[in-house]
C-alpha cells in the first residue's frame, strides 16, 4: 500500500473498506480479552472507524495511527468530538480525553507512544497491505507492542485473483506462518460473510470468510 494510493482513496472518498457499523466480531469477542476499563488500546491504520468509539465506551484509552489527515479529521467531525491538535515529531496528534490519533506513517511512529499499551485491535490494517508489504507491517506492529499485550485481529480471506484489493485476502495459513514468531494465536471464529458484502458479490467472488483471532505478544 503506497501512501499516494491511500491518500487518493480518501480524497476520492472511495472508502468501501469503512464500515458503517461496529464490527460484530469486536462486539462479540472483545470481552474475551478480559481487560480492565482503563486499558490503553492501540488501533493501527484506524481510519475513521466507529470501532474506536466502541472501545472508548468500554472505558479504554484509544491510541490510533492513521496515514491520511482527512480520515482523522472526519472521525472527529462525524462523531461531533472536539479535539486538540499538536505536533509530535513527524506526526500530528489529535486527541480528546479518551481518544488520541496520530496522523502519519506507522513505520515512523515512536515506540514511546505505545509503551504503556496492553491491548490492540486490528480489523482493517493487516488486510490493507498487499502480500509484498504485509509481513513488514506485521513486524512493525509487533515492535510497537509491549510483551504480554493482547489483541483482537480480524481478517478477510477469499480467492485473491477474483478481486483487486484492498482489502486483501489473508488466509489462516498466512497468519500462522507470519505472526506465530511474535504472537501466541488462538482462532476465535471463522464464518462466511459473502452475503453481507455486495461489492464482493458484484465482482463474482465465489466465497468470502471473515475470521477473528486472539493474539498475545510474546
Curated annotation (Swiss-Prot):
One of the Pfam families matching this protein, by short name: TPMT
Swiss-Prot/TrEMBL catalytic activity: S-adenosyl-L-methionine + a thiopurine = S-adenosyl-L-homocysteine + a thiopurine S-methylether
Signal peptide (from-to): none
Subcellular location(s) of the protein: Cytoplasm
GO biological process assignments: methylation; response to metal ion
Any one GO molecular-function label of the UniProt entry: thiopurine S-methyltransferase activity
Binding site for S-adenosyl-L-methionine: 10, 45, 66, 123
Main location as per UniProt: cytoplasm
UniProt superkingdom: Bacteria
Keyword entries, A-Z: Cytoplasm, Methyltransferase, S-adenosyl-L-methionine, Transferase
GO cellular component, one term: cytoplasm
The EC number(s) this enzyme carries: 2.1.1.67
UniProt record similarity statement: Belongs to the class I-like SAM-binding methyltransferase superfamily. TPMT family.
NCBIfam families reported in the protein's UniProt record: PRK13255.1 (NF009732), TMPT_Se_Te (TIGR03840)
Name of this chain's protein: Thiopurine S-methyltransferase
Organism: Shewanella baltica (strain OS223)
Phylogenetic lineage: Bacteria, Pseudomonadati, Pseudomonadota, Gammaproteobacteria, Alteromonadales
Amino acid at each position: 500500500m503506497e501512501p499516494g494510493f491511500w491518500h487518493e482513496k480518501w480524497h476520492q472518498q472511495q472508502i468501501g473498506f469503512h464500515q458503517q457499523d461496529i464490527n460484530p466480531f469486536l462486539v462479540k469477542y472483545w470481552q474475551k480479552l478480559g481487560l480492565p476499563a482503563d486499558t490503553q488500546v492501540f488501533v493501527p491504520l484506524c481510519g475513521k472507524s466507529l470501532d474506536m468509539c466502541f472501545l472508548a465506551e468500554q472505558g479504554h484509552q484509544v491510541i490510533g495511527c492513521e496515514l491520511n489527515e482527512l480520515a482523522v479529521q472526519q472521525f472527529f467531525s462525524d462523531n461531533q468530538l472536539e479535539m486538540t491538535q499538536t505536533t509530535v515529531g513527524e506526526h500530528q496528534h489529535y486527541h480528546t480525553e479518551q481518544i488520541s490519533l496520530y496522523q502519519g506513517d506507522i513505520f515512523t511512529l515512536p515506540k514511546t507512544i505505545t509503551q504503556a499499551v496492553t491491548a490492540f485491535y486490528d480489523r482493517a490494517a493487516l488486510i490493507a497491505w498487499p502480500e509484498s508489504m504485509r509481513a513488514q507491517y506485521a513486524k512493525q506492529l509487533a515492535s510497537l507492542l509491549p510483551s504480554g499485550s493482547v489483541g483482537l485481529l480480524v481478517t478477510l480471506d477469499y480467492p485473491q485473483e477474483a478481486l483487486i484489493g484492498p482489502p486483501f485476502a489473508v488466509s489462516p495459513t498466512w497468519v500462522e506462518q507470519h505472526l506465530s514468531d511474535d504472537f501466541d494465536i488462538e482462532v476465535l471464529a471463522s464464518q462466511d460473510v459473502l452475503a453481507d458484502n455486495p461489492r464482493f458479490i458484484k465482482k463474482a467472488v465465489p466465497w468470502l470468510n471473515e475470521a477473528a483471532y486472539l493474539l498475545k505478544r510474546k
